[in-house]
């Protein structure tokens, strides 16, 4: 029995090509786009990419997660000191999820290059999720933030964490909040080491959650203007709280706030 003939996808009308692309998972689309300049240009022309979501994670290993129309693809970049493993790829399927591991000497650099290509193919300027543990790649935090500043117009939901209390990430936190635009949600779960910590807090968020908010005193609270505000471990006194509530009720301050929780 002779092998099947290659399917001439590029000879199809564009609408038919687009239907073929809709049946592909995001990795298949990216792999197709890498074949030639022509396939790359065709890959960038699809009209349904607005339904795709792109998420970035920097925890134990950097990750790019792509939510397609049917499948969710996660690409992990795993640091390796084994020369034989450098560049190797492992893929596993689990239901709707496709897990892709890429072994690299410099996972952050590879993660950046792969992300730029993903953004180009799917014609994205903003990303849906950024989740970052600031104590994982401390020496590269500034480089990562500068990269995001140059390549991402905005982030819809951002979560920042600190796993090692002994590592001071105050400056990195402030630098990220000064340079990355956050549209909808900010979750901040880190320890504060400096009394003068005073980062920019985005305005008009749908939700602001700060789990160690000792640095947010009364005057700073008056500046917060988000729809839902949750502040844990907060030092505001009962007297200040009562004054704030009175101002809030008569709409003298924080007019966008609909829900406020202090602990």
Stretch-by-stretch model annotation:
Residues 1-263:
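Non-core capping and flanking segments associated with repeat-based/extracellular domains
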């Amino acid at each position: 029995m002779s092998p099947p003939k290659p399917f001439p996808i590029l000879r199809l009308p564009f609408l038919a090509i687009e239907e073929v692309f809709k049946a592909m998972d995001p990795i298949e689309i990216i792999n197709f786009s890498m074949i030639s300049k022509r396939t790359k240009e065709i890959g960038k022309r699809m009209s349904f990419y607005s339904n795709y979501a792109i998420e970035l994670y920097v925890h134990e290993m950097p990750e790019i997660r792509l939510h397609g129309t049917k499948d969710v693809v996660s690409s992990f970049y795993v640091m390796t000191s084994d020369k034989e493993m450098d560049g190797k790829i492992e893929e596993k399927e689990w239901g709707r999820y496709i897990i892709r591991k890429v072994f690299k000497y410099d996972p952050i650099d590879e993660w950046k290059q792969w992300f730029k290509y993903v953004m180009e193919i799917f014609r994205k300027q903003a990303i849906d999720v950024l989740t970052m543990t600031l104590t994982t790649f401390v020496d590269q935090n500034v480089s990562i933030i500068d990269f995001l500043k140059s390549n991402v117009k905005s982030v819809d939901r951002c979560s920042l964490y600190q796993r090692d209390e002994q590592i001071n990430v105050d400056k990195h936190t402030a630098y990220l909040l000064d340079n990355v635009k956050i549209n909808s949600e900010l979750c901040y779960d880190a320890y504060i080491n400096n009394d003068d910590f005073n980062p920019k807090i985005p305005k008009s968020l749908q939700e602001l959650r700060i789990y160690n908010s000792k640095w947010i005193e009364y005057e700073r609270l008056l500046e917060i203007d988000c729809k839902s505000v949750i502040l844990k471990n907060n030092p505001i006194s009962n007297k200040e709280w009562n004054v704030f509530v009175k101002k809030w009720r008569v709409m003298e301050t924080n007019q966008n706030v609909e829900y406020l929780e202090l602990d």
